[in-house]
Amino acid sequence: METPSQRRATRSGAQASSTPLSPTRITRLQEKEDLQELNDRLAVYIDRVRSLETENAGLRLRITESEEVVSREVSGIKAAYEAELGDARKTLDSVAKERARLQLELSKVREEFKELKARNTKKEGDLLAAQARLKDLEALLNSKEAALSTALSEKRTLEGELHDLRGQVAKLEAALGEAKKQLQDEMLRRVDAENRLQTLKEELDFQKNIYSEELRETKRRHETRLVEIDNGKQREFESRLADALQELRAQHEDQVEQYKKELEKTYSAKLDNARQSAERNSNLVGAAHEELQQSRIRIDSLSAQLSQLQKQLAAKEAKLRDLEDSLARERDTSRRLLAEKEREMAEMRARMQQQLDEYQELLDIKLALDMEIHAYRKLLEGEEERLRLSPSPTSQRSRGRASSHSSQSQGGGSVTKKRKLESSESRSSFSQHARTSGRVAVEEVDEEGKFVRLRNKSNEDQSMGNWQIRRQNGDDPLMTYRFPPKFTLKAGQVVTIWASGAGATHSPPTDLVWKAQNTWGCGSSLRTALINSTGEEVAMRKLVRSLTMVEDNEDDDEDGEELLHHHRGSHCSGSGDPAEYNLRSRTVLCGTCGQPADKAAGGAGAQVGGSISSGSSASSVTVTRSFRSVGGSGGGSFGDNLVTRSYLLGNSSPRSQSSQNCSIM
């Protein structure tokens, strides 16, 4: 069974055999054949889309698996990190507590040392005074040898008195210790009484709050009841309530006053007892001190006490040195532990950052694939909806009549003048290709020539003294920017080199202004290279602009709407098929020579959009912006004017045919 296109071709052939064909009629026939060829290529395109959807499903599965692996690893690392951090905090807290304890002990030891040193100084003064008196006594002894017997008897008497005094001193010291103990007990009882007073005050406040709450509740209940009774009953209940509340207040105030009086009486009595005990103890201590001063005339006891104090002082100093050494060791141990924990935390952060970077790369790839698949689906749906085509392939048409189509179209200029230009579309796209072999990459190049941005993607600082940025704008002279001799780009940092005409502020090390150049330049081919101090190219980014112009025509004869693609400029002027649309790189390809149309289109049309691809030379992500200019009258739907009449869709592999008259070649 013949298709509608075959029937139209048969009818056209019969008419052509019976009547001579006009140039317009020949053009229509040739366009019908081209439309049939488009159907074949659309079928190939649909197969390609299906294969891409299959690949996308596999990639989605891989991305899902990668996300699950990354989430599990991040959760494990996070748990380990939190556990290690908790252990480090516990260790730090224990070290801080031990340090505080050692500092307290050190302060106590220092106070004891100061007290012992003062006592030692005082006893040394007493020793010197006693030695001077000993000399006087020896002189008296020499002058009073005659009264030796009397002195000996007095000596025995004095020795007895000394023994009695020592006993009294021991008793007084015991009494002093007991007085101190009583004073401490009194202070503890005082603190206890103050605590009880505070507790009673809090209980009083609590009782007040309870009574206030009960009062409010009682008022609320009475107010509820007063709604149902008359005014006389209401006044009676209010007076009763006021009397009851007044009695409650009086009772509570009496109890509070009684508690206060009892507490004050108890506190005053205990305070008076403590004061009396302190006074008695101070009197006893004064008497004891006087007796001790009298007893210090004995050199032997002073010497013994002095030697004992010196021994105690030496022991305290040794203990102090031991404590200082122990504190130093604890500090060193704490520093080592903290350094190890910080190093482990830095390693975990680095691993987490690496995994996040890998996940971000996978996510970027997924987003790019989703964008491309969405665009392909929209294009195919628009073509199928407008042309109502089935995916069944037809036989390929030879391209032998392409030249006749071109010549007859030119010869029938008088007929084509009847066509009205409905709409035209201009697409300007920027394709970027980057390559990096070192730590620093050219991250971004401004299309208007305002700035160039570099990024250090490594974990180490990069010295960039005397490095150069070389900018080549097509056939224009080479521009070279040289970094300062001591410039260093830190790890993960970004530096932007602004042209002086951009109006940026010089703020090293993140923003540098090239005062010698007003602009970095702009054009259809921009190549930016980073050269190190040895002259080696370590990074490069190339930006190429391509421009295509698409026109949408309408014929007024019996054949209706048909596709027509204009390949702007002189590209493939002699012969060739309509251009193919490469789905992967999103550039228009010549159907004859397979070269990008931007080389032939050059700078034709208006620049209104850009296509930006980032990453290495092996992959690119493209986003295209376009505008639409409408001329003439009439027009189709959005899908007819903007998408389906713009490009002839085919597979991603360009056709291989003769390229005799191709301007690209």
UniProtKB/Swiss-Prot annotation:
Q: Where is the composition biased (Low complexity)?
A: 395-409
Where is the stretch described as Linker 2?
219-242
| Keyword list, A-Z | Acetylation, Coiled coil, Glycoprotein, Intermediate filament, Isopeptide bond, Lipoprotein, Methylation, Nucleus, Phosphoprotein, Prenylation, Ubl conjugation
N6-succinyllysine-modified residues are K32, K171
> Its domain of life?
Eukaryota
Residue positions, PTM Cysteine methyl ester: C662
Record's InterPro entries? IF_conserved, IF_rod_dom, Lamin_tail_dom, Lamin_tail_dom_sf
Q: Where is this site: Heptad change of phase?
A: T266, E330
Q: Which residues carry this modification: N6-acetyllysine?
A: 32, 78, 97, 108, 114, 123, 135, 144, 155, 171, 180, 201, 208, 233, 260, 265, 270, 311, 316, 341, 417, 420, 450, 457, 486
Point out the cross-link Glycyl lysine isopeptide (Lys-Gly) (interchain with G-Cter in SUMO) in this chain: K201
Q: Where is this site: Cleavage?
A: Y647, L648
A Gene Ontology molecular function term for this protein is: structural constituent of nuclear lamina
Q: Which residues carry this modification: N-acetylmethionine?
A: M1
The covalently linked position for Glycyl lysine isopeptide (Lys-Gly) (interchain with G-Cter in SUMO1), per the record, is K599
Residue positions the entry lists as glycosylated: S626, S629
Region described as Interaction with MLIP: spans on this chain: 1-130
> Quick one: where's the S-farnesyl cysteine lipidation?
C662
Record's protein name: Prelamin-A/C
Query: Native species of this protein?
Result: Mus musculus
- The gene is Lmna
